[in-house]
């Protein structure tokens, strides 16, 4: 009997983006980001410096303390990653519509 291990062929989409809105990633833009991330099945992370946050957790996003001008790294992995990545990328690049 042989034991077959399934190997994970997970792909991921990742990109670095500058926070451009005046007040940075505070409660309102964090809520907008999380609300959009929750629409997708894919795993979403947002990172700044050495801190990696679950992109579907408002508390995690707020812990990044991403001020205007800081760079965040968006990573999306999962079945709808391309659509999720594009949606979340636009939200960041548009300054969270603030």
Which ranges hold each PLM region?
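Intrinsic-disorder/low-complexity, polar/charged segments enriched in Ser/Thr/Lys/Arg/Asp/Glu/Gln
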Residues: 10-16, 71-73
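Compact, glycine-rich, soluble single-domain proteins
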Residues: 18-68, 76
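Long, contiguous binding/interaction regions
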Residues: 2-3, 7, 86-87
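Generic marker of residues within folded, mature protein domains
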Residues: 7-9, 64
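C-terminal structural segments of small proteins and small subunits
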Residues: 67-98
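Residue-level signal for pocket-adjacent positions within structured domains
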Residues: 14, 18-20, 91
């Amino acid at each position: 009997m042989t034991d077959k291990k399934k190997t994970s062929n997970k792909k991921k989409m990742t990109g670095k983006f500058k926070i451009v809105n005046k007040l940075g990633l505070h409660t309102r833009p964090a809520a907008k980001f999380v609300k959009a991330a929750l629409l997708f099945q894919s795993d979403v992370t947002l990172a700044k410096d050495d801190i990696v946050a679950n992109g579907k957790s408002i508390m995690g996003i707020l812990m990044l303390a991403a001020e205007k001008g800081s760079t965040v790294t968006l990573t999306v992995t999962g079945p709808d990653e391309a659509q999720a990545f594009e949606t979340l990328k636009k939200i960041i690049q548009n300054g969270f519509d603030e």
